């Protein structure tokens, strides 16, 4: 079968003259005497020029099997040889009238008089090409990533949600979608997130982890969950993919944020003195009249309204709607006879609020992106939740019912004290049998950010959930807490323990010491904090109204997003450890300082000036008292009928 093609006709027969085949496929041309003695052969075959004069050159140079040396071991062809070759195999004889052959001695061959060049380096493999680069100086503190070598095969589970073949097919598609995003990130020019480019082993591990999580958490709807995930992956932008990779690396290897920087935050500079900023703050005050429908309380509920609210609670027999999952359950303030506080068992929910991606002009081609929960990246409607709580919880928002638990109080006038400096405060709340109650209160001075008050608060109802993921308050904080003393420092004690007061009313009384009715009280979504403390204050500055959402109230911009956008600062980065109320209060105050600087640029261009601690309008302009506040429509979008022609 090989004879007509002659594929091996130029290859010397391994058996040489001892070959017993009548029609051997190898060459049996006479060999030169130099090949008779193998000890003289120390090089590879070099084809002479005369051997190819009568025909075209071959496509590839063929190498003979390396002969054995005197020691009996074959010399490796892969090892470069730098010394001169003493002798070479004889060239193929040129067919003629006889069996004569033309040969050239070693001294006549060009290849015998020069050194053999070393072999060319092989190209990098794909695994090496896409391996994560060395950590930068800022990431040198991170532990090395040691991804296990796993095959792309679904992990064994005690109760598999689907057949192995189905899981393997789904896993393959999931891995392919991740590889496409990883390749896209690797090709991104000028990328500063090179450590986020995963190696092949890390990609396999990430795909296995996600498939296993879906199989364990949602076995009944496993196929739907994972298929929606596969469809969603190609629609992710690079920024969204980077966030998912960071979350995976943090959970799998680092246990901290990969991009976390230990450098201190830059100090905010507005170019204004504290007195000037306080003077300009009077232009940022928002009247609350007309905002009652969005949760702002401007008057105390009457006794009749409070009694009606209590009667309604009594007739409902404790039935409430869960603030997390939306289910109905029954709550028992003071505990039921068997000691239970609620019914309904565990609560399955999503701790994060749903995120609705902004629309793009290409949505009619690529399709609109699905809304999802940032806590687990699941699309809305995929599952009932990714987190389980021990009990259901509820929240009370109606002012009349809030007053039935603890009545609202207006900020009192303190005749023995003069004007007070603006105060920025933040509250943390937890769930009890009476709803969402105050459990921590922090107040700082504005604009210096000096701590005035930081205390824990014992709620009035039995605690159902401290909401530690957001409040940052854990049971051990109450265990270590010490009773509040007015003579002690407002900060924590040396062992990290906070001071605690016995009720929300006591915490409210402490906050009133720093306020007058005309003292600007600053907060983010301040209606929630005021309602938790049961305070009615006429002079407020709310960053929700200073930085309104494009679609207006009741939609609000989050504090974390505003701080990142206007201050280039990262807050609320502790994950499951919760928020820091002091950090949030200072960040809220800095947002007001930024707005004050912007407002001063506008006022200065119109001729306004600052004398002492007061704003002086230009001649002929409206007085400061008439134009010192935001309009009543601040914070919410106007209707078309309200727009002037």
From Swiss-Prot:
3' to 5' exoribonuclease required for proper 3' end maturation of MRP RNA and of the U5L snRNA. InterPro entries: Exonuclease_RNaseT/DNA_pol3, REX1-like_exo, REXO1/3/4-like, RNaseH-like_sf, RNaseH_sf. Its main location: cytoplasm. GO terms for cellular component: cytoplasm; nucleus. Residues 99-124 have a biased composition (Polar residues). Keywords: Cytoplasm, Exonuclease, Hydrolase, Nuclease, Nucleus, rRNA processing. The keyword rRNA processing applies. Belongs to the REXO1/REXO3 family. Its EC number is 3.1.-.-. This is RNA exonuclease 3. GO terms for biological process: rRNA 3'-end processing. It is an enzyme of class 3 (hydrolase). Transmembrane segments: none annotated. It is found in: Cytoplasm; Nucleus. One of its GO terms (molecular function) is nucleic acid binding. Residues 49-153, 611-645 are annotated as: Disordered. PANTHER family: RNA EXONUCLEASE 3 (PTHR12801:SF112), RNA EXONUCLEASE REXO1 / RECO3 FAMILY MEMBER-RELATED (PTHR12801). Residues 421-601 form the Exonuclease domain.
